Curated annotation (Swiss-Prot):
A lipid is attached at C23 (S-diacylglycerol cysteine). The keyword Signal applies. Part of the ABC transporter complex OpuCABCD involved in carnitine uptake. Involved, with BetL and GbuABC, in osmoprotection and cryoprotection of Listeria. Can also mediate weak glycine betaine transport. This is Carnitine transport binding protein OpuCC. InterPro entries: ABC_Gly_betaine_transp_sub-bd. It is found in: Cell membrane. PANTHER family: ALIPHATIC SULFONATES-BINDING PROTEIN-RELATED, CHOLINE-BINDING PROTEIN. The keyword Membrane applies. GO terms for molecular function: transmembrane transporter activity. Keywords: Cell membrane, Lipoprotein, Membrane, Palmitate, Signal, Stress response, Transport. Residues 1-22 form the signal peptide. The gene is opuCC.
């Protein structure tokens, strides 16, 4: 399976390389050499974090920063950095990059996974992987508070004793995923739900809230989790690999502007999963622009009190 994945990743990487070489994505190719270019995916989370970095770097260093938007995947982000089209990518995830660009096996221990990507990206790509912001965006099982109380559910293992009574809503793709999909999960936890409802991930949270199922599998930083007062069940067997979020920068840009390292490190451990949920909801639920959400986060946490 690992060989198949690496082969597939290589094909996708070549395709994205040819694409990026033949045409410019929005924001690519027209920047001044004195401008710091931050790559961001189209997700709300990536948009918010990239704006946090932009505002903080401009405030602390006086450097001009632009965001290169809508880099559609880890593969595209990776190739954009290799091509020199961006200097920093705002949201990189340990589990994704470990098995993607590095082509390694998944590592379940978060600290070991972080150490592996730091070492791998420095040695192979001359890029610096920063410490985690403090949040991980991973798969997580969740239930309503009434369900948790009724069945005394705190961990994923707790579901085993009532598996025949629980219906579950899950992401369509999760049913077929190798390694961390339903078959592997069922084997690891010895759990088979009464009934499973595969559906689009965006529909799961509301369906759970509206009592259409008892359990749902979603993403840990989704803003609807606190809004709907859902309870997250601890992955006590550490089945899902860690997806801790960090910034990634080229060694070249850090050598040219060493002050960037100090500024980026200010965010180490400063954005918890709960905080990221709230920030995502500010944008998705309250329809605020990610740039506004970023500014409000920095102001609230007094990041603008230092250099100017």
């Amino acid at each position: 399976m690992k060989k198949k994945f690496i082969a597939l990743f290589s094909v996708l990487l070549l395709t994205s390389s040819l694409f990026l070489s033949s045409c410019s994505l929005p924001g690519l190719g027209g920047s001044s050499k004195d401008t710091i270019r931050i790559g961001a995916m189209a997700t709300t989370e990536s948009q918010i974090v990239s704006n946090i970095l932009k505002e903080l770097i401009e405030h602390d260093t006086g450097l001009k920063v632009e965001i290169v938007n809508n880099l559609g995947s880890t593969i595209v982000q990776h190739q954009a950095m290799l091509n020199g089209d961006v200097d920093i990518t705002a949201t990189r995830y340990t589990g994704t990059d470990l098995v993607g660009p590095l082509g390694e096996e998944a590592i379940k221990d978060p600290e070991k996974a972080l150490a592996a990507v730091k070492k791998g990206f420095e040695e192979r790509f001359h890029q610096t992987w920063f410490d985690s912001y403090g949040f991980a965006n991973t798969y997580v099982f969740m239930v309503r508070q009434d369900t948790a109380k009724k069945y005394n559910l705190n961990t994923v293992s707790d579901m085993r004793k009532v598996e025949n009574e629980l219906t579950a809503g899950v992401d369509n793709s999760w049913m077929e995923r190798e390694g961390d999909g339903y078959k592997a999960f069922s084997k690891a936890y010895d759990i088979e739900f009464k009934k499973i409802f595969p559906m689009q991930i965006g529909l799961i949270y509301t369906a759970l809230k509206n009592n259409q199922m008892d359990v749902a599998l979603g993403y840990s930083t989704d803003g609807r989790i606190p809004t709907y007062n859902l309870k997250l069940l601890k992955d006590d067997k550490k089945f899902f690999p860690p997806y801790d979020a960090s910034a990634l920068a080229t060694d070249e840009i850090l050598k040219k502007h060493p002050e960037l390292k100090t500024t980026i490190n200010k965010l180490k451990g400063k954005i918890s999963t709960e905080e990221m949920q709230k920030l995502n909801y500010e944008a998705d639920g309250k329809l605020k622009e990610p740039s506004i959400v970023a500014q409000e986060f920095l102001q609230k946490n007094n990041y603008f009190e230092g250099k100017n």
